[in-house]
Amino acid sequence: MFKKNINIKIKTKILNLRKKIEMWNNNYYVKNLSLVSDEKYDSTLFELNELEKKYSMFLNTSYSNKIVAKNICNKFKKIKHLSNMLSLESIFNYKNLLNFHEKVKKNLFYNEKRYYCCELKIDGLAINLIYKNGILDSASTRGDGLQGEDVTKNALEIKSIPHILKKNNLSFPKKIEIRGEVFIKLSTFNKINKMLKSKRKKLFSNARNMASGSLRQINPKITKNRSLSFYGYGIGYVNEKKYYYDQHDALKLINSWGIPIEKNTELCKSLNEVKNFYEKSIKIRDYLDFNIDGIVVKVNSMKLQKKLGCSSKYPRWAIAYKFSSEEKCTKILGVNFNVGRTGVITPVAKLKPVYFMGTIIKYSSLHNKDIIDKLGIMINDTVCLKKSGDVIPKISRVIFEKRKNVKEIIFPKTCIFCKSKIEFCLRKKNLYCTGGFLCYAQRKQLLNHFVSREALNIKGMGNKIISQLIEKKIIKYPSDIFKLNTDKIIFLKGMGLKSSENLIKEIIKSKTTELYRVIYGIGIPNVGIYTSMNLANYYKNISNFINTSYEDLRSIKGIGSFTSNCIKKFLKDKRNISIISDLLNVNLKIK
Ligand SMILES: [Zn+2]
């Protein structure tokens, strides 16, 4: 019974994953829309593959073809591939690579060399070119692996695809499939997007979408204007055995016929060399004029490739080893300074918008001066964004080789919001505005903090209400809240008679409160809820607290020198004392 339930669960899971992939594929291939980030897509597909491998009884064999069949758009004629054109299975770590290697090893012929042909995995779209006696006969997309869309007219507009192969000392085969990747150079991508922008047309979110949209065009003239590029990566079907070459030699062969190939390709003689190639690829990707999202590892021996064969979905002799912690590069256009509740000033880099992990990133926090110095960031620098956990990507490094016309990041001397003095906190390595409630940037957040659940706990007084009250200059300091009446709040957006009355009731209720709530609510830097309780417990009433000394504070268990300094400094400021006495003047009853 138990087992049966689990089976149903797994089956549902597999079906749901398939549905998701199908929906994404359909949007991606037919409408050129990426609904999810590449990483999300890859990891979902990986999860599905793993489940299907483990629970093969649920694997409906007609399925894999069925889902991709929908990926063919009706606007193109279909062309049948001479040999299947499967996509590659993706892996993400060295352990997966070892597994792949073990499987290959099991199938080794006696004294067969374990070489791998390693190539950069260009992020474009696959194309199948059929040459008959050296003349381009047809070009098609991958489609469902069995047949693709006829894009011959468009392929003829791609300069790097030869219409006629170059003669060498080997005669041309009667029929050969040459496979490769069509992509768009990043420099071209930027140029075209700039042009589209000037015409107020919709921009492409990434180079691959642009390449795909440009190749799969009814109008070949558009393909021509987009100046697509092409690299060959292998041979599919060929009618004569004498053209059966090992992968690395096959690349040399097609290159001698005038097919451009990517020049970083390496023949790796050990797994260690594959690993080195992978690491090298991560380093060079920033300098390439095209996007790569990993490397392709192919068993070099043709004989062994044939022996390994294919599963229902993937060839067993090749694998796509993807970059796991994806990096994206962009430029720092400037730096803004945000002021937080406690006055901390956070430098935020304004970035040249970049599509990353499924969203467009425009800003990235630089945290503090220390981090800026450590990374050596300057305005106009080209920087790399790196995925950090599941949250917002962070700037991980500067590409110093690309440094040009840089400017130093200069921190303001006075607060840009309230002109108060800016001080440096040595321990936290950050700058903060000393304005407190006087600072417009801090006021809203301080007041929100003051009414929050653990502080004065005024129910119904949310951010929206506070923002309006501040904008209308009805409140400025905490004590102003207790001077509110229904007449002053009934006109606010989202308020009615009933809700106004309720809010006033809540405000009145909160006037009888506890000491720790007030200490916490006035927002002393570095004083959280537990420290506030600790202090309230010790001082018993507000005037004892106001008149305390540093030594007295230090004598309290759990309060260190840093916190003591923060409190003492806060209490030294007359403005803060008047905020507290104003609260007492509006009859705040502190228990
Ligand atoms: Zn300020």
Swiss-Prot record:
Gene3D superfamilies in alphabetical order: 5' to 3' exonuclease, C-terminal subdomain, DNA ligase/mRNA capping enzyme, Helix hairpin bin, Nucleic acid-binding proteins
KW Manganese (keyword) present: yes
Species for this entry: Wigglesworthia glossinidia brevipalpis
CDD domains in the record: LIGANc
Enzyme Commission code: 6.5.1.2
Alphabetized UniProt keyword annotations: DNA damage, DNA repair, DNA replication, Ligase, Magnesium, Manganese, Metal-binding, NAD, Zinc
Family annotation (InterPro entries): DisA/LigA_HHH, DNA_ligase, DNA_ligase_AS, DNA_ligase_CS, DNAligase_adenylation, DNAligase_N, NA-bd_OB-fold, NAD_DNA_ligase_OB
Plastid recorded as keyword: no
Cofactor: Mg(2+); Mn(2+)
Family label: Belongs to the NAD-dependent DNA ligase family. LigA subfamily.
Highest taxon above the source species: Bacteria
Positions annotated to bind Zn(2+): C415, C418, C433, C439
Lineage: Bacteria, Pseudomonadati, Pseudomonadota, Gammaproteobacteria, Enterobacterales
Residues binding NAD(+), per UniProt: D38, E39, K40, Y41, D42, S87, L88, E119, R142, E181, K298, K322
Disulfides per UniProt: none
Active site positions: K121
Function statement: DNA ligase that catalyzes the formation of phosphodiester linkages between 5'-phosphoryl and 3'-hydroxyl groups in double-stranded DNA using NAD as a coenzyme and as the energy source for the reaction. It is essential for DNA replication and repair of damaged DNA.
One Pfam family cited in the UniProt record for this chain: HHH_2
Single GO term (MF): DNA ligase (NAD+) activity
GO biological process: DNA repair; DNA replication
Protein known as: DNA ligase
Reaction it catalyzes: NAD(+) + (deoxyribonucleotide)n-3'-hydroxyl + 5'-phospho-(deoxyribonucleotide)m = (deoxyribonucleotide)n+m + AMP + beta-nicotinamide D-nucleotide
Top EC class, one word: ligase
